[in-house]
Amino acid sequence: MGPAGCAFTLLLLLGISVCGQPVYSSRVVGGQDAAAGRWPWQVSLHFDHNFICGGSLVSERLILTAAHCIQPTWTTFSYTVWLGSITVGDSRKRVKYYVSKIVIHPKYQDTTADVALLKLSSQVTFTSAILPICLPSVTKQLAIPPFCWVTGWGKVKESSDRDYHSALQEAEVPIIDRQACEQLYNPIGIFLPALEPVIKEDKICAGDTQNMKDSCKGDSGGPLSCHIDGVWIQTGVVSWGLECGKSLPGVYTNVIYYQKWINATISRANNLDFSDFLFPIVLLSLALLRPSCAFGPNTIHRVGTVAEAVACIQGWEENAWRFSPRGR
């Protein structure tokens, strides 16, 4: 174990916060494969083991993601979160956790309040490859730097036939002023001041259209990570946009805007609730039931394979992505 690994172990033993402090800090130019251990809070969200979205580890038991990645009618225990691996489908290094509870922001609608928290079935064990990212403080004014990083397994080109990239991608993107972003997305707004703005206070814009650096379909729910005062802080959640990396920047849910709700949800999640007792019972029941059993009128039926479930999920994601506000 090297000096960095020893220091990391000491921090854990002393109970000192390790959020936003990856052990490895090697860099790869934006838009290419990310180095192992550089983004230890990055997680992949799966439905019946099929990749659907990204997310970030924000505590020992909570994942932050986009609300549009989740459908409330789907069975919670069919969701899993994979941590510790930068390659989708690599079962050798990833650690899998089931989702026991889903909390979607109560005001979520279309692109508004596009944020959700997932409670894992058990606490995560932190390692050099699995660490949480820090969240903004509600009591301290946060100065967002001019450049931050977006990570995910989404398309590297909008025209790509693949729905996601197997290797985790990273890109350094400039933060775009909200008013400037509003003018890009809503150019007639300056002539119609009564028109409702597109880029509201709960959104952040980021992207480099000249060098084609942007998030895209498949990156939904992933973090916008900013290096501030020596630690990595999540300031955004990949939400939507138009034409990946071309003429308009990507739009992210503003984590700072929803931080009070996030803190309150995390605080409640740390307490035992009904889901902690129900989840083991549900898993046991599933083990005893046949694969073709139905759980209700809104359930996606599984007959031997998960083809129908995947088609439903990918179809919803594709429609959201094509919708004027892009759901990745």
UniProtKB/Swiss-Prot annotation:
Glycans are attached at residue 263. It is found in: Secreted. This is Serine protease 48. One of its GO terms (cellular component) is extracellular space. The keyword Glycoprotein applies. Its EC number is 3.4.21.-. One of its GO terms (biological process) is proteolysis. Residues 1-20 form the signal peptide. It comes from Homo sapiens (Human). Keywords: Disulfide bond, Glycoprotein, Hydrolase, Protease, Secreted, Serine protease, Signal. Residues 28-267 form the Peptidase S1 domain. SMART domains: Tryp_SPc (SM00020). It is an enzyme of class 3 (hydrolase). The active site is at 68 (charge relay system), 114 (charge relay system), 220 (charge relay system). PANTHER family: SERINE PROTEASE 48, TRANSMEMBRANE PROTEASE SERINE.
